[in-house]
Amino acid sequence: MSGTKPDILWAPHQVDRFVVCDSELSLYHVESAVNSELKAGSLRLSEDSAATLLSINSDTPYMKCVAWYLNYDPECLLAVGQANGRVVLTSLGQDHNSKFKDLIGKEFVPKHARQCNTLAWNPLDSNWLAAGLDKHRADFSVLIWDICSKYTPDIVPMEKVRLSAGEAETTLLVTKPLYELGQNDASLSLCWLPRDQKLLLAGMHRNLAIFDLRNTSQKMFVNTKAVQGVTVDPYFHDRVASFYEGQVAIWDLRKFEKPVLTLTEQPKPLTKVAWCPTRTGLLATLTRDSNIIRLYDMQHTPTPIGDETEPTIIERSVQPCDNYIASFAWHPTSQNRMIVVTPNRTMSDFTVFERISLAWSPITSLMWACGRHLYECAEEESDNSLEKDIATKMRLRALSRYGLDTEQVWRNHILAGNEDPQLKSLWYTLHFMKQYTEDNDQKSPGNKGSLVYAGIKSIVKSSLGMVESSRHNWSGLDKQTDIQNLNEERILALQLCGWIKKGTDVDVGPFLNSLVQEGEWERAAAVALFNLDIRRAIQILNEGASSEKGDLNLNVVAMALSGYTDEKNSLWREMCSTLRLQLNNPYLCVMFAFLTSEAGAYDGVLYENKVAVRDRVAFACKFLGDAQLNKYIEKLTNEMKEAGNLEGILLTGLTKDGVDLMESYVDRTGDVQTASYCMLQGSPLDVLKDERVQYWIENYRNLLDAWRFWHKRAEFDIHRSKLDPSSKPLAQVFVSCNFCGKSISYSCSSVPHQGRGFSQYGVSGSPTKSKVTSCPGCRKPLPRCALCLINMGTPVSSCPGGSKSDEKVDLSKDKKLAQFNNWFTWCHNCRHGGHAGHMLSWFRDHAECPVSACTCKCMQLDTTGNLVPAETVQP
């Protein structure tokens, strides 16, 4: 310690004690602030802690440096270096009854008096104490003392014997050090290297020197001015820090020629540097007359690539107090905690808080790291907000194989949870499109298959000017209404809407029966009414009222329908026009809107947004002329595209308009899963190549990867390759011929010709078992199997030779002809190999290559070696 500025030290093994050193030694006990408030004389260190003075030691004047004994016992033994070069062992009144009490008061005296600059206890051999002294031309500057050595014999003059304070016994001085190092030079700083108790790093006058006590005549050194405050990183023993003036040098002892990193501080000189004992690669520095401590985080420092490459660091500054800081000390166990002391002995307990790093997992778990602690955010609210998140929904749908049912396409909405009416409409639309495309292809290939997937908008446009209306009688009423004659295109539109089945029959009876079975009484009654069957509508409403979950008010509605009259000025029409606005069910509203509207003016039905789009479109196809229908479909399509409503796929189909609609849907919901499966269902090639479609598909694939759904990702890729052959990836691995370099698998997987069928890597599955034993390109023979000695490509036979367990190689006929058994298999180290089936059989009982004179341990070169049972491996 220089001047009167105090220094501070934490006890190495007593985490609640520290000592302040200046002209005397003061021992403090740290406790929580709540308890310390009850004691007089406590000093507040922070909001949570306070210090109580335990003892003061004033027996060692002229202190220049202090080092706390590193062992557990004795607890409060300190070495004090004095201005005359002596090192005194003292305590703070805690060890008078200890078995080590003879150590207290012991002095270690150099031959020539000069200032002691630094002290360092050996962390491995705790009895060794290194002292660094100023230069003397006739003496060494680094002395290593053994504190357990006996006192000096008779050659010591009696005048050097003194009485210990408070004791009658005499304690003799020790003048013979264990080692003497560094002649004709000053030692400014010392530290032992933890990797070896015999290695000592010393900051001499103009160099850093590493002394090996096993051979003290030699030393390794490097010339530098940064010789002060040498300290070893406790987590990386080859990394050392030292300083000079305003610069900090970071050294790597494995490359000791020059610093690996130089940190430039402020113009003011440094007074202390210290590695954090609880945090990897965190270095704290303090400059003179400053209230700021700078921290350098070298945890993320990359390894230098070239001689001139300096690693990057993360730098930050902390201000523990407002006054100038004289010294600081890291707490030995509490994370990132330090205590600072000012020149007037004001102390502050301070914790350096880490930068918080957030991590949000793909399954919506939120965690953050703060130092050693890892916290997980748990949702305590019961609003099921997590279940409503689209990522959670997509993940659950992926587990249920949503979108992969290509036979009964409509079932995909059930796999999605059967909760979203838009998804239900979408998958029923795609189901009808697939169904009627197949039906049209069977009737007249190439006729209307592509038109079906183009949507009702394109279908309606193809029949403009071809439809006329005619008057039709009501069922149950003496009335006639104009209905458009259904041509082929309008019938197809009604089929896509689900009102009628495929074929020439236009009866909506089956559709009504399905609605009744699902309990959609109001919708079924409305569809029956739109088909001029008021009697069937009343019957359905009565059935709904009498059902278990039915609404009794349906009887009232049925009664109102039964009183229908065609007179424009009747009381019935007036009352229904008023009361329909008070009905909650949209289908009941449109029923009365239809009955009270004028011929051709059906806006009350067509623009009721709560009615399903497919029902409104089907209604329009029955009652609107070509011009009105086209105008209505165009307007409705634009509304669906802007809103991103999946029901609009019925209108747009899987066309560019459909991509625009789906883009709005994805922007609104983020559901790339539905967008991907929908576009793959039947879109033409130009639509599949759209950048937006490819973007949704790739993002969904990335989502499956992020969720670690590897099998689901594979299923999706297979599903995609079936519906979009152009997306099938090229082979990433193939076997090439040693002579011509051409791929063997390319020719083997080609279409069979002239009665010779080749399957990939060998034999076909045909009963003839065609053989491929040569390269299809140059006709050179393929390599031979190391076990059966037959050219590769032939059908695998049972493994030749005896085995320790015949049942292990007794392959069934199915396994003998399995394609995997014929694959080319070889070791990347020795290049020997053979049929996969033979290799698996061999390595069940052996670890060494089957080729004679080859000692390669093929199966133990990678993790696949773990597949071989240890008890079956031959030594």
Swiss-Prot record:
Zinc finger (C4-type): 735-781
Zinc finger (RING-type): 782-863
Key words of the record: Lysosome, Membrane, Metal-binding, Phosphoprotein, Repeat, WD repeat, Zinc, Zinc-finger
UniProt WD repeat ranges: 58-100, 111-155, 182-221, 223-261, 265-306, 320-360, 395-437
Major localisation: membrane
CDD domains: mRING-H2-C3H3C2_Mio (cd16691)
Effect of deleting the gene: Embryonic lethality around 9 dpc. Conditional deletion in neural stem cells specifically impairs the formation of myelinating oligodendrocytes, thus brain myelination, without effecting the formation of neurons and astrocytes.
InterPro entries: MIOS/Sea4, MIOS_a-sol, WD40/YVTN_repeat-like_dom_sf, WD40_repeat_dom_sf, WD40_rpt, Zn_ribbon_mio
Binding of Zn(2+) 1, residues: C737, C740, C775, C778
The name this protein goes by in its record: GATOR2 complex protein MIOS
Biological source species: Mus musculus (Mouse)
Designated gene of the protein: Mios
